[in-house]
Swiss-Prot record:
It comes from Saccharopolyspora erythraea (strain ATCC 11635 / DSM 40517 / JCM 4748 / NBRC 13426 / NCIMB 8594 / NRRL 2338). This is Adenylosuccinate synthetase. Keywords: Cytoplasm, GTP-binding, Ligase, Magnesium, Metal-binding, Nucleotide-binding, Purine biosynthesis. Binds 1 Mg(2+) ion per subunit. CDD domains: AdSS. Gene3D superfamilies: Adenylosuccinate Synthetase, subunit A, domain 1, Adenylosuccinate Synthetase, subunit A, domain 2, Adenylosuccinate Synthetase, subunit A, domain 3. Pathway: Purine metabolism; AMP biosynthesis via de novo pathway; AMP from IMP: step 1/2. Its main location: cytoplasm. Its EC number is 6.3.4.4. One of its GO terms (molecular function) is magnesium ion binding. One of its GO terms (biological process) is IMP metabolic process.
């Protein structure tokens, strides 16, 4: 059986939690392969319970599924324990959660540096969540990071923390005029936290490959979205990892020939959190109405999301760079009640019409959307469970987005509930 990649096709917050929850019903394994607790997703169960998850894969809510925090993820031990405690308090079985020994740990000094750096940048800030994600990935690339397996050997952990604080404290004290961190305090804190998750540490790369050899289905869950990818996103307003499908192999430890399909998640309109270019952004009442109707506030930060119309240029780009085979279109219900719905089909960049993503950062910043107006609908779509039950104009809207995006739309979300989904085709 296959490995299936699930990836956001916009700037994150597309509704990946619901898609993972749906696909997780046919998977035996759900693997988070990059990012950290800088992104969140909400899953609503049939009984009305909603769960906000930031680090743990949303497959944790499906009985019998083994969940993995992969080697490409950066793990804040405190957040991990808080999330586990929150799930267990609501009688969710967390015994089937494993953590890669090769994942990196977000240390207290990563969070401290992330927060003071953003404050120092002021209006020039990138808009990070201040969770220490970027500084942790910096240490990983510089080969001075602390890995999950290091908590199993206090001597190695202490050596790494001492070496790190020799430099980090210089930055905190001399550059930002902040108090330095104490080695013993950091080590003791992390070791104390590790006592509560050490039994979950495993060679997950081996276990995932063995599962595939047995014919089991593995769902590889990315966080954030394509346009936030450090290589393929709107750099420098991006995250520090590769949420695109190519990152799934590196972040989980499986080879590319294991992947059978790539499912992209598209919101029926577009949102973005933080700074950076956003060609279809609405700064008027229409944008505020979308924000309120869609509940567009970040799960992790609570920040208001920027809103705009659907952008087919970035959808086509996401299809190409991810090799997307199927799309899950979310929040179609939010557009109910609009007379017409603009869809961006191209950009005007300094007088030239382009239908593909501009090559340069300047080009993206100069992009002015070229819209096609589609007729809206007034009927309530939240109860539809087949494509044919949707209003004719809603069907036409979906078909047009499918045509513009370059991959079939196989599932459609018509509400926040787990059951409020239309499945048109079997995905992957």
């Amino acid at each position: 059986m296959p490995a299936i990649v699930l990836i956001g096709a916009q700037w994150g917050d597309e509704g990946k939690g619901k898609a993972t929850d749906l696909l997780g019903e046919q998977a035996q394994w759900v693997v988070r392969y990059q990012g950290g607790n800088n992104a969140g997703h909400t899953v609503v169960l049939p009984d009305g319970q909603d769960f906000a998850l930031h680090l743990i894969p949303s497959g944790i809510l499906t009985p019998g599924v083994t969940n993995v925090i992969g080697n490409g993820v950066v793990v804040d031990p405190g957040v991990l324990l808080d999330e586990l405690a929150g799930l267990e308090a609501r009688d969710i079985d967390t015994n089937r959660l494993l953590i890669s020994a090769d994942a990196h740990l977000i240390m207290p000094y990563h969070v401290a540096i992330d927060r003071v750096t953003e404050r120092y940048l002021g209006k020039k800030q990138i808009g990070t969540t201040g969770r220490g994600i970027g500084p942790c990935y910096q240490d990983k690339i510089a080969r001075v990071g602390v890995r999950v397996q290091d908590v199993l050997d206090e001597k190695i952990l202490r050596q790494k923390v001492e070496a790190a604080l020799d430099i980090k404290n210089q930055i905190l004290v001399k550059v930002y005029n902040r108090r330095g961190l104490d080695v013993d305090e950091v080590v003791d804190t992390v070791l104390g936290q590790a006592e509560k998750f050490a039994g979950r540490i495993a060679d997950t790369k081996l276990l995932i490959n063995q599962a595939l050899d047995r014919g089991e289905t593995v769902l590889l869950e990315g966080s954030q979205g394509t346009l936030l990818d450090v290589d393929h996103g709107t750099y420098p307003f991006v995250t520090s990892s590769n949420p695109t499908s190519g990152g799934a192999c590196a972040g989980s430890g499986i080879g590319p020939t294991r992947i059978n399909g790539v499912v992209g998640i598209l919101k029926a309109y577009t949102t973005r959190v933080g700074a950076g270019p956003f060609p279809t952004e609405l700064t008027d009442d229409a944008g505020e109405n979308l924000r309120k109707a869609g509940g567009e506030f970040g799960v992790t930060t609570g920040r208001s999301r920027r809103t705009g119309w659907f952008d087919a240029v970035i959808a086509r780009y996401a299809t190409r760079v991810n090799g997307i085979t199927d799309y899950f279109l979310t929040k179609l219900d939010v557009l109910t009640g609009l007379q017409t719905i603009p869809v961006c089909v191209a950009y005007d960049v300094d007088g030239e019409r382009v239908t593909e993503m501009p090559m340069t950062q300047t080009g993206v910043h100069h992009a002015v959307p070229v819209y096609e107006e589609l007729p809206g609908w007034w009927e309530d779509v939240s109860g539809a469970r087949s494509f044919e039950e949707l209003p004719a104009n809603a069907q036409a809207y979906v078909k047009r987005l499918e045509e513009l995006s370059g991959a079939r739309i196989s599932a459609i979300g018509v509400g926040p509930g787990r059951d409020q989904t239309i499945v048109r085709h079997t995905m992957a």
